[in-house]
A protein has these predicted regions:
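Short, surface-exposed beta-strand/turn modules with glycine/proline-rich turns
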Residues: 60-69
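Sequence/fold signature of self-assembling virion shell proteins
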Residues: 68-71, 75, 119-251
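Long, contiguous amphipathic alpha-helices that act as assembly "spine/axial" helices in icosahedral shell
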Residues: 1-61, 81-108, 224-232
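Proteins with a high burden of low-complexity, intrinsically disordered sequence enriched in S/T/G/P/A and R
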Residues: 1-2, 64, 78-82, 139-146
């Protein structure tokens, strides 16, 4: 069984790598836009190998974006009232949409759990030295019919030459409140290889991702080399932006 799995890994490893790279780029665009007020920028960091440049915007309404009353910084950890900022978002949205989740980075969760006022909110002033965990905050939120917090930990790898650089697309300073259900769609078009396939290339499909496999070197008697590529003419589109709210925790 182990030999079989290793053989499958050798045969499918390159294909899985390039397919995952396409999924990673789609996640990067979606999570980047979702956590940056509906905007995503193609630049040297997000697209170092060139091609598409510029930015896209899904037009989050200005009234859906709020800044914290006090910056969520280490200097303010004993005075900042995280829930006051959260309550302001809930108040602003209550007549427009039913929010289900608050998406945020692990660092924002850790900060909330360590603040003095959050400990007092969860445990009371007499037990404010007791540690607060995410499940404690979410128990409080669920009890009061508020959206629960969900950490975003996605890391993608961006190809830059021969190096794959880890990149976190989520803006760790923002908390994004979303309604239940799907937030958008992935729009697709036919790729070039679907419209005009090349000779000597083997193609396969994974959903709307097309992989290409070809070899060089055999005819010339030189070293045989195989190449694998994945291609997808796709763009994630956030369709529910009018019901999505952003809290900027660092003013």
């Amino acid at each position: 069984e182990d030999k079989k799995n290793r053989l499958i890994s050798i045969m499918m490893g390159d294909i899985q790598t390039v397919v995952n790279a396409v999924y990673g780029k789609l996640d990067m665009i979606f999570l980047g836009a979702l956590s940056n007020e509906g905007k995503f920028v193609f630049d040297e960091t997000t697209n170092p190998e060139g091609g598409v440049k510029g930015s896209i915007s899904f037009n989050q309404p200005g009234e859906n974006i709020a800044s914290c009353k006090t910056a969520w910084t280490l200097e303010n950890i004993d005075t900042v009232d995280c829930f006051e900022d959260i309550q302001a978002i809930l108040d602003a949205s209550q007549d427009k949409v039913a929010l289900a989740k608050a998406l945020l980075s692990p660092s924002r969760i850790s900060y909330m759990c360590r603040t003095k006022k959050m400990k007092q909110l969860i445990w009371g002033a007499d037990k404010s030295s007791k540690p607060v965990l995410l499940r404690d905050i979410n128990d409080f939120m669920e009890t009061n019919n508020y959206p629960v917090f969900e950490p975003i930990r996605r890391i993608v790898r961006i190809q830059k030459g021969r190096e794959a650089i880890p990149y976190a697309p989520w803006n760790q300073d923002n908390i994004v409140f979303v309604p239940a259900g799907e937030l958008g769609v992935v729009k697709n078009a036919y790729s070039d290889c679907e419209l005009k396939p090349d000779e000597g290339v083997s193609y396969s499909k994974y959903g709307r991702i097309v992989t290409s496999l070809w070899s060089v070197g055999q005819k010339e008697g030189s070293k045989h080399t195989e190449y694998t590529k994945a291609e997808s003419q796709s763009l994630p589109v956030i369709t529910e932006m009018n019901g999505i709210y952003t809290l900027k925790t660092v003013a």
